Amino acid sequence: MIDINEIHTFGTSHTQGGGFEWNDTNNPKKLELLDKFYSHLDIPKKQEFFSWPGQLHQKTGVEVINHGQSGFGDEKIYRSFYKLLEDKNFYNSINKKLFIFEFAEMGRKEYFCNSINDYIILNYWGKNEQGHFHDYEKYDENNLDFAFTNDFYNHNVILNSNELKNKYFNFFKKSWSPHIYQQKISMDAIGFISFLETLSINYLIVNSPFFRLYDMNTYISWGITEKEVEFRNGKGDMLGMVTKEKLTISDETNGEYQDGHAGYEGNNIISDYVIKKINKTYNLIK
């Protein structure tokens, strides 16, 4: 049994606890619905307690540091992880830590912005007469739409400059290619996971990397499936389980609160599967 003192989770809003922004005072309707459906729960009304990492902490007693952030993707995962390694004390005790990753799909591109001295995230998708669509092969610079910010729920720091937004988005449209972006996302994930393996870092994956152009096992002989959490519908498919098993907030509130993130019970189930995989792979938690 490995002696572990910390678990670090990385990912998108699905790891942060999306939909449970109890501090989003700019959205009174959301707060009203959260209070209606979840105020009876005997837990603090904070996002962290409704997320699966928060429930993981409650069930295991192990400190869980949640680096997930709404809107961001794999580039944020890599930045956050490497930032931790800059601390020599942290690195020297890395064998006592477990890292859990929720990789994102396409649709997220990160830039550093000098004018705010921070990273900004561009979320993009296709748009036609029927609305939004997510078939990346059909995207072109004429049918892309986007959201652009450095914090989706802290409305004080959302980028309000349309000129700045349009500059980045116009550059993105001119430099974007579905094949090239799929290739880059795949290669970056292969490199990152290979790095984890080289350092013998304890890690698990709840949502598998985006691989459309490469067979993961061709590049990493051990096979990624050994580290993927096994959910009801298959390995490394946390988001798929939430949708297929009707575990979203929308499902949990009978459609009254429309939100595709995991509900409280959905996150509870996710944390149970994560604990099961932790025990099976590392024998860390009893």
What do the PLM-derived regions correspond to, one by one?
Residues Y82-K286:
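Alpha-helical cap/lid subdomain in secreted, periplasmic
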Residues M1-Y82, N89, I269:
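Serine-esterase "nucleophile elbow" of acetyl-processing enzymes
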